[in-house]
A protein has these predicted regions:
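Flexible, acidic/Gly-rich N-terminal and inter-domain linker regions that tether
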Residues: 1-52, 199, 208-210
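Conserved AdoMet/S-adenosylmethionine-binding subsite of the radical SAM
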Residues: 84-87, 96-211
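Conserved beta-strand segments that form the floor/walls of ligand-binding pockets within enzyme
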Residues: 4, 25-27, 89, 132, ...
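Conserved Radical SAM active-site core
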Residues: 3-10, 36-128
Length: 211
């Protein structure tokens, strides 16, 4: 199998439970909720995405076989971090369109803690160490358990009071990044203040001016 990768880069996790943690990000090309073209955004299922996942032209992007992909990932980690606490985030786009058991198995052999960020449309039995599900209100929601649930807010079709009964350890609301960003931040904070166990998640990497 060849994996189509937008980019592989070093950074800190900027949102959710692992905010501030050093990581290698493996961003896969492609998504099943938007094709990534601006002209098609308004009619897509996820029309507020803030990520460029089109093509393979990002840093360390390309089409890789398994061995080469692992080599690039190890190189990015080893030239950046000295810690043996290896942490990788599989993201997209929608990573579960491409991630398979061979990739997961090989990353585990290299002692990576594997986190995946998915929109929840695809069920999976792959043995990740951490699963973050970020559902979209107009999409099918099939993966309804994991470690961390992250809802971009506001999405008014979700019943946030019922969602907390699902099988997740942590529940985050993340302000929708749009022209009403300040308003969304205040809405998020105010909701979380009075509705446990919801907790606000902010994209600190954007505040710091990093990827």
């Amino acid at each position: 199998m060849m994996y189509r990768v937008k980019e592989i880069f070093k950074s800190i996790q900027g949102e959710g439970f692992f905010s501030g943690k050093e990581a290698v990000f493996l961003r896969f090309t492609g998504c099943n909720l938007w094709n990534g073209r601006k002209k098609d955004r308004s009619k897509s299922i996820c029309n507020f995405c803030d990520t460029n996942f089109v093509g393979t032209d990002g840093k360390n992007g390309g089409s890789y076989n398994l061995a080469k992909l692992i080599s690039v990932i190890k190189n990015v980690w080893n030239h950046t971090y000295t810690s043996e606490d290896k942490f990788i985030v599989l993201t997209g786009g929608e990573p579960l369109l491409q991630v398979d058991d061979l990739l997961v198995e090989k990353l585990k052999k290299e002692n990576f803690f594997i986190a995946v960020e998915t929109n929840g449309t695809i069920k999976t039995d792959l043995k990740f160490d951490w699963v973050t599900v970020s559902p979209k209100e107009n999409a099918e929601w099939n993966l309804r358990k994991g470690d961390e649930l992250k809802v971009v807010y506001p999405q008014y079709k979700f019943d946030l009071k019922k969602i907390i009964n699902l099988d997740f350890k942590y529940f985050f609301l993340q302000p929708k990044d749009e022209e009403k960003n300040r308003t969304n931040i205040l809405k998020t904070i105010n909701y979380c203040k009075s509705h446990k166990p919801w907790f606000p998640s902010f994209q600190i990497h954007k505040s710091l001016g990093i990827s």
